[in-house]
């Protein structure tokens, strides 16, 4: 599509909002995108739509970098040598953690999409991980790791293995890493932080890979749509991340577990009963 359309821009805004909200909450952005896509379909080729849904994640990633810039910046002049070394170790932990899902994603992305990218799998994953999330909170176990600096390289790798589960649509990237981190003994806050940091290389890699596969031969209007979606995702992500980090200081994840179960039932009902 090459003509300018306010309707398509409006759709890009809505999709950017959905992306910005659901990427950072453990509720599955894919599950929401499937539902939204039923009602708000971009009037472009399937190839471009697929690229759009991945590339707008750039906006979400930028939000993480802005919010946690000081913590993630090893060159911050306000940090002493010890703090700078700790920041370097933080990045090493993130790199170690992202290797498993990165390797599996590169090798089997097309196979996983072909086998699992459907409403049934998404709905089941929403419900199953919702139940796990509720059960996890009912354990009421005291966290062993209450600060990110306490996370070891071995623990980082183990959390990274949990992120591999997110390759199955409906699982939720943030949900799988948060569940894994809490199961392994981190506090909710550390689990959420690590999930956000892991998103940087994970989503950057996925977006870059998608762009390389699709090529860069988009029309001017298609580039505009990509830009609008990314900017909206960035702004919404800023708000959602700040809200979520404040929320988990005083609350647990059960509400997200119940929400996932309800959404999973809605997806099943919509696609099989309506």
Swiss-Prot record:
- GO function terms (MF aspect): undecaprenyl-diphosphatase activity
State the InterPro entries in the record. UppP
Question: What's the Enzyme Commission number for this chain?
Answer: 3.6.1.27
Coarse class of the protein's main subcellular location: membrane
Localization, per the record, is: Cell membrane
Question: Does Hydrolase appear among the keywords?
Answer: yes
Annotated transmembrane regions:
7-27, 48-68, 88-108, 115-135, 151-171, 189-209, 221-241, 253-273
Catalyzed reactions per annotation: di-trans,octa-cis-undecaprenyl diphosphate + H2O = di-trans,octa-cis-undecaprenyl phosphate + phosphate + H(+)
Query: What cellular component terms from Gene Ontology apply here?
Result: plasma membrane
One Gene Ontology term of the biological-process aspect is:
regulation of cell shape
**UniProt membrane topology term:** Multi-pass membrane protein
Give the top-level enzyme category. Answer: hydrolase
Record's keyword terms, sorted: Antibiotic resistance, Cell membrane, Cell shape, Cell wall biogenesis/degradation, Hydrolase, Membrane, Peptidoglycan synthesis, Transmembrane, Transmembrane helix
Task: Tell me the protein family, please.
Answer: Belongs to the UppP family.
Q: What does this protein do?
A: Catalyzes the dephosphorylation of undecaprenyl diphosphate (UPP). Confers resistance to bacitracin.
Query: What is noted besides the main data?
Result: Bacitracin is thought to be involved in the inhibition of peptidoglycan synthesis by sequestering undecaprenyl diphosphate, thereby reducing the pool of lipid carrier available.
What's the protein called, per UniProt?
Undecaprenyl-diphosphatase 1
Which source organism does the UniProt entry give? Clostridioides difficile (strain 630) (Peptoclostridium difficile)
**Which lineage ranks, top first, belong to the organism behind this chain?**
Bacteria, Bacillati, Bacillota, Clostridia, Peptostreptococcales
